[in-house]
């Protein structure tokens, strides 16, 4: 089930909210658990069993780890979860690699990827690791652990919520009118970002893939549009997840912090998909030694993390290329580039970041490595195409307003303007009156679009 579907917005969510708030507090987790499983079953009925098996393994594994302080039990539990992720996500990549290297003809298994497996597996792993480290207390109520893992606001596309951040809220959380209203506001803003901006940018990117007569300018428009589409698509889902969490009394950590204003690649990845970046930092990079054990190990650790980050996003070589490309730039910045770019004007540093990230997302989007390099060459006119043509002019005119809104919306500009206006008591009152009206208008526009549109999944569902 999609957050951006009529069935979710006007049937599932209202029913869950009504039943949740009329239920006594001590039973509300059960309502969330039941409806989270129904939510998942709507799209993946057979893979509910897989998720429940992983929850059971994590529950008993953590209990045994806590009781016996056993490294062996810890490793077995971790291997089971990583093993299941690898089987369902990487089997065909492995078979394809074997076929390419050894010229064999092993048939692909074509295993369907369970929605959200990368996200909920990482949540389970963080819980088990933190229990082993003594960072969190083991959860002795399997239903509470199941609620944590399967909580529908963040189940299928994050953010990756750590057990330590919401364990207290599983037992006791504040559900206030203020928190609920903030949740509704955040959810509607995320909904509008997805439907009115990300989907429109996605249409433009689709047009690019269908046009035979491309131009150099069209390659640039596509590259910028796709980069913005990924941002608005995924940050929109995070907004909706955080908003839904607030409605039910949970506080999820922020997942994006205006990454496109960054002045270095390092800063960009502190601001983009924060829950994933911090996960790899805490559970892979630091345990490997981080930056403490010499230059060679620093390089090794960064490249390992970014190889894993790339392959986490998808079982294809373009994702590995994307991850290693980012990793190499992070290494270069760490070793020497940062001291030079820090002397440049802020605008030039920002342009440098945007260019590198744009190139990386061309790799991220490509169906193959050859396609990635072909599209990168197109940016520089190396595919023997004209600089501009009629197709480019037509599509630029058609999507110019959306592009402008997206470019400025990816910065704190609108937020800063509103905050400055709110410093005036008079304007603050006007904004407080107009904001609910604006949100209702957004919801109506989104609803009209959804009624008239087809399937519009989030990009990160495939991860």
Please describe what each predicted stretch is.
Residues 1-462:
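Membrane-embedded transmembrane alpha-helical bundles that form the catalytic cores
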